[in-house]
Structures are given as structure tokens and as C-alpha cells.
Amino acid sequence: MRAVVQRVSRGEVSVGGEMVSSIGKGFVVLVGISIDDNENDVMYMADKIVNLRVFEDEEGKMNLSLLDIGGEVLLVSQFTLLGDVRKGRRPNFMMAQKPQEALKYFNLLVKEIEKRGVSVKTGIFQAMMKVLIENDGPVTILIDSKKVF
């Protein structure tokens, strides 16, 4: 499981010109689910997202988590994060999970983040979305549950 975590002052998802989800301060998380992901990857990712300390404390130091600031998550499925461009010029998406299985893990990730005390909004799975990301910083963190980077 791979995620791009962006600290935001706000985020929105629109489908077909209509806003379907929005958050204030927190994270917009773009997540790609791999063919070899399982529940352990979901738990790892949920813990990292909820406890990542990238919000500034009273001294300006990145020391606070979503839990500490009462932040929200806008979780957006993005299979293209699994694209392999090592060969050729067109991405190979062979490592991306099939949609039905990916949706199962995506929904589990939503539940696990919420279970840890953070509000989660989502885009619409498999829809063509417009994602508004108002970066705060900017602060962008890459997380891979297989610890590839």
C-alpha cells in the first residue's frame, strides 16, 4: 500500500462538477492498493496516518499529529501510485489491486482510521475526480507499507 500524505488547510473532492467531500485542516491522502496488500498493510497505514507528527506545536516544531490537532482526513483512492515507469514511457499498472479487492481494503482503511479517532471523508471509488488540495507548508510525505522508501 502506497500513500501520498499532504498536510492541508483544506481539501475537496468533486465529481461531475458537484462537491462530494471536503475537509478543513488535516491530510489529503492519495492511496494506492497493491496486489500483495493485506490487512497488515491497512493497519500499518492507518497507524502512520493518524500518528504522523507533522503539525506545528506552539514553538513551531513539527511535533503534533492529527489526533493532537483534531484534524481530518480526505482519503482518495489512486491506483496510479502503483504505476511502474522503469521500462518504456507508459506506466505499467500490474501491481495495482483489482477494483473489487482494492475497494475492500480502501473501506477497511477508512474504518481503521476512524477507529483511531480521526474523521475521514472520501472521494468516490473509481470515479473521475477533481481533487482540490490546499497544501499547508507544503508538507508532503510518502509512505509505503512494504517500506520500499
From Swiss-Prot:
A motif (Gly-cisPro motif, important for rejection of L-amino acids) lies at residues 137-138. GO terms for biological process: D-amino acid catabolic process. Keywords: Cytoplasm, Hydrolase, RNA-binding, tRNA-binding. It comes from the Bacteria. The keyword Oxidoreductase does not apply. GO terms for cellular component: cytoplasm. Its EC number is 3.1.1.96. Its main location: cytoplasm. It is an enzyme of class 3 (hydrolase). Pfam families: Tyr_Deacylase. It catalyses: glycyl-tRNA(Ala) + H2O = tRNA(Ala) + glycine + H(+); a D-aminoacyl-tRNA + H2O = a tRNA + a D-alpha-amino acid + H(+). The keyword Thylakoid does not apply. An aminoacyl-tRNA editing enzyme that deacylates mischarged D-aminoacyl-tRNAs. Also deacylates mischarged glycyl-tRNA(Ala), protecting cells against glycine mischarging by AlaRS. Acts via tRNA-based rather than protein-based catalysis; rejects L-amino acids rather than detecting D-amino acids in the active site. By recycling D-aminoacyl-tRNA to D-amino acids and free tRNA molecules, this enzyme counteracts the toxicity associated with the formation of D-aminoacyl-tRNA entities in vivo and helps enforce protein L-homochirality. PANTHER family: D-AMINOACYL-TRNA DEACYLASE 1, D-TYROSYL-TRNA TYR DEACYLASE. Homodimer. A Gly-cisPro motif from one monomer fits into the active site of the other monomer to allow specific chiral rejection of L-amino acids. Belongs to the DTD family. This is D-aminoacyl-tRNA deacylase. The gene is dtd.
